[in-house]
Amino acid sequence: KAAMDSGVATLPITDMKAYRQRLSEFVYNSAFVMKPIFARAKADPKRIVYCEGEDSNVLLAVQVVVDEQLAYPILVGRPAVIEKNIEKLALRLKDGENITIINQDDDPRYKDYWQGYYEKNKRNGVSIELARRDVRRKTSLIGALLVENGDADGMICGTFSYSHLHLKYV
């Protein structure tokens, strides 16, 4: 586009969107496989919880998801930390606009969530205190509860640590 605007390009590009699509197919080897998946996601975007919402790599991925309109991201984490990382990375993510931040320290659903978690797991050794603590601290558990209670359609977790540590909450 810059070459066309400056007059350096010898052949004008009539359809910039199609041209970019062709270029992306060269860059991404998985484009052939992923294209129909992305098209389906764009047609019906879902609410996806990112359990490690404070992580820089997660935020970079969320920016791509927002830019491509693939889903409505829900980030679990402390708003101050998330917003600081968004600013540091110069991202265009805004709570309440193109993302939602779930602050486990003051979410109004906290009581319902820990009580439900306790009722479901009390026979497995989960005490009331443990339920309260885990629903406040375990981001994968928070994500799973959001999905279970219909507040999200899916979740992504396990970007750090071992997967089996996250899967026990799913």
Spans of model-derived segments:
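Contiguous, glycine/small-aliphatic-enriched amphipathic segments in soluble metabolic enzymes
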Residues: 1-158
